[in-house]
Amino acid sequence: MQEHLVVTLDGKDYLVEPGTNLLEFIKSQDTFVPSICYNESMGPIQTCDTCTVEIDGKIERSCSTVIDRPMTVNTVNNDVKDAQKEALDRILEKHMLYCTVCDYNNGDCEIHNTMDAWGLQHQTYEYKEKPYEKDYGPFYRYDPNQCILCGRCVEACQDIEVNETIRIDWDREHPRVIWDNDVPINESSCVSCGQCATVCPCNAMMEVNMEGNAGYMTDTEPGSLAAMIDLTKKAEPGYGPLFAISDSEAEMRKERIKKTKTVCTYCGVGCSFEVWTKDREILKVQPSHDSPANKIATCVKGKFSWGHINSDQRLTKPLVRKNGEFHEVEWDEALNVIADNFTSIKEKYGPDALSFISSSKATNEESYLMQKLARQVIGTNNVDNCSRYCQAPATKGLFRTVGHGGDSGSIEDLEKAAMSVLIGTNTAEAHPVIASRMKRAQKLFGQKIHVFDIRKHEMAERADRFYQPKPGTDLAWLSAVTKYIIDHDLHDKAFIDEWVDDFDEYYKSLETFTMAFAEEATGIPESELIKFAEECAKAESVVICWAMGITQQDIGSDSSTAISNLLLVTGNYRRPGTGAYPLRGHNNVQGCSDMGSMPDKITGYQSIEADDIRAKFEKEYGVKLNPKAGKDNHEMVEGIHDGEVHSLYLYGEDTGIVDSNINFVQAAFEKLDFMVVQDEFLTFTATYADVVLPASPSLEKDGTFTNTERRIQRLYQALEPLGDSKPDWKIFQAIANRLGFDWNYKHPSEIMDEVARLTPLYAGVSYDRLEGFNSLQWPVQPDGTDEPILYLEGFNFDNGKAKLFPLSFDNYFKQDEIYDIHVNNGRLLEHFHEGNMTYQTPMIKYKVPRAFVEISPELAEDRGIHEGAEVKLISETGEAVLQVHVTDRVKGKEIYIPLNNDAMENGDLGAINLLTNSDVDQYTDTPSYKRTSCRLEVITKRGKSPLNPNNFRVNKKRHPQYSVQVQKKWERSDYVFPGNQVDK
């Protein structure tokens, strides 16, 4: 096989690997060729024709040319320049250059930069205005009169995000970008991911916050702006001087527009991007091809939901309760109140009378200091985080079988799999950027997607096969499928022999898991399960993703274990495109646990009960550590009711809304002797506190987050803390010092250095290695070597072998006669968790103003109710009043309630956790949120829909196509390829 081909570029020979994109090769040699429609994250679109070069004597597009033979390429001869000039002129026929007064004149307008670099002075064709007005959506706007029809937005929507809303109508006299069947943006099925604005090479598609805000003259009234544009164009003899002026203005903007790399503060995908700020105003979020987890992708929250940063609801001063009411105080007073109460409670009841809940939204460094405060300063292991509410069972299942509690590979591996299996995960709304990777792999590369869920969400609709098991019965079908694969000799015997222990004992435990048993338990027909088992066993590579639909059950740990068992039996670990992916819900829920904010584990999952581990930390901390595992979140609440816990300190967590059975939780808060809440806002939980401390959000501090794929990334401070708020790490340090310790961290990098010294999993992590968009995936060796794919050198047990774990099942789903409706619950695309941050962005709230309940058409008909009806849901533990959205996403007596309810405005009204109970997974104490039943009472039979009429759930009309369909452009009578025109 020939390894390299000779390419002669402008007279010089190069050895090039076959399959290399010609345009990318030319760019790698620092040779300029215009390429306005090309984007390295999307590949060739072929609409702009500016990248033409001469290949073996013929003018062709370099962007779509693959080097598959020796070739001679010329980028500078007259024919090439003539063809490029023709293409550039056609672009300026569609796009008016008024750079100095354009919001996009920030140094990265690709039309401006290309024309300038090429040296274009005059355009041949006069600009032609199109008969269209600007179209404004809630977050971005489209200006057809500046659009060059490059199709990047279409490619992004159709084949990167795969939301399939945007296309170009090439058939009209004046082609333009359209949404759905040519409706306004705000009436379309657009989910507002914003990637169209991200990839637009000019000001045609632009964030609303940018308009009129970026430049020194861009806020000019439209009529005056038009006059200024005309005057400027008439005054300049050519584009050279015009570009010089606009370049000077762009340089001036650098002094007022700050671009700061950060990491998204919402879900566990870990999207990174630059945030553009002017003073405190957030202009835009701009992801990069260098963003390791997301590349150029975002979702509506990461791209646009930053209203919480400057919300007038932000806390800017400490609050101390006096005579039943909160009063603003200075930090000294607040710290003294905390120190006095912590000291008195510890002296009276002992250190285990105090408890601490860490935040999965805060940085690694802050999570580390919270557990250090609990263990070193107070002397208790009563510290936990919200992974207890969702991810602990997944981690338990992986610890049992493969030894590491994290994703097996990288997000990019999900695209490489031949088959993706999604179980109990509403990926398109909870982890939309990951969902887009899978949708793209399915659409463009034939990946097979199988979805097991009780609710027909978007991924279920798109799946090659969708299965609806009875609630809480996934372990039954998972084990039956595994048994069938072994029974029919479809298992990977070579993999098992070399890499897996306990096969015989495990196989024996599967005896009762017949396909007939699985059908009876789950309701999935035996024939469908057999077909799935055979496809799964024969697929070249399989990944399984799961989330709260699995973990928030009373057998969440066992169901997670069953997933890993299936992957081991089929040999789907230790390779790209394989493995277990428990999709983490919060931006740093992985990191928070990594940092030891757990009652039985210190950093890197080292046991606090192990003498050698404690000795290491005792040497670093200078105190003796408590050898007994502490209480987890669930046990803390019970401990308050039992009189064992007297103080609670939590930060970045609205426990009084998000914990299960919140009537029980709120009653516990009332019994506390002393409670401290640290947050951006006066949350619902904070209203129970004695002291409330104002904390700074992610844009106001430095630190690191660790995402679902174990990827550690830096975030940089973009803004100063608002008012007297402080980063959490500074608050913890102040409290520790007020209690007599001498913490002296100057920067979070020093905290991470300490973590690295103590934690084998993070041994090679340093801020220098995380500079910019660089990242590391744990475990990280001292020399900085990381592991994008786990287990290549063996599983995380002493002998390097994985373990199959025997399981049993008796978790049959039974419909209660009184509480006859099963209550499912979970995330929404627009809001995050309880919604405290997302409700602060007005246009997000406009999209989904309140919580609601999804009810099936069958149940609605049975109860005589319609869209917008008001119902009371009553469970054994409480009741909630909600408005109805009738949808076929749920069936029969299944209902679905989103987690968000805007508790800061509405209190706990309509909160799902008024209905949930205190049942938990026996191994992790994770609440069985998904094991909830209720009865329904009708208050009103119809009303106004709880969803905005323009919400994409109502306007669900996808228009899938492949790319921009450029051939339709080429078929137009007014199109001639510039190379052909030159040939003529």
Curated annotation (Swiss-Prot):
It holds the Pfam family NADH-G_4Fe-4S_3. Its EC number is 1.17.1.9. Keywords: 2Fe-2S, 4Fe-4S, Iron, Iron-sulfur, Metal-binding, Molybdenum, NAD, Oxidoreductase, Repeat. One of its GO terms (molecular function) is 4 iron, 4 sulfur cluster binding. Residues 252-984 are annotated as: Formate dehydrogenase. It catalyses: formate + NAD(+) = CO2 + NADH. [4Fe-4S] cluster 1 binds at residues 95, 99, 102, 109. [4Fe-4S] cluster 4 binds at residues 264, 267, 271, 299. [4Fe-4S] cluster 3 binds at residues 157, 190, 193, 196. Residues 79-119 form the 4Fe-4S His(Cys)3-ligated-type domain. [4Fe-4S] cluster 2 binds at residues 147, 150, 153, 200. One of its GO terms (biological process) is formate metabolic process. Residues 257-313 form the 4Fe-4S Mo/W bis-MGD-type domain. One of its GO terms (cellular component) is membrane. Residues 138-165, 181-211 form the 4Fe-4S ferredoxin-type domain. Binds 1 [2Fe-2S] cluster. Binds 4 [4Fe-4S] clusters. Its cofactor is [2Fe-2S] cluster; [4Fe-4S] cluster; Mo-bis(molybdopterin guanine dinucleotide). It is an enzyme of class 1 (oxidoreductase). In the C-terminal section; belongs to the prokaryotic molybdopterin-containing oxidoreductase family. This is Putative formate dehydrogenase SAS2201. It comes from Staphylococcus aureus (strain MSSA476). The lineage of its organism: Bacteria, Bacillati, Bacillota, Bacilli, Bacillales.
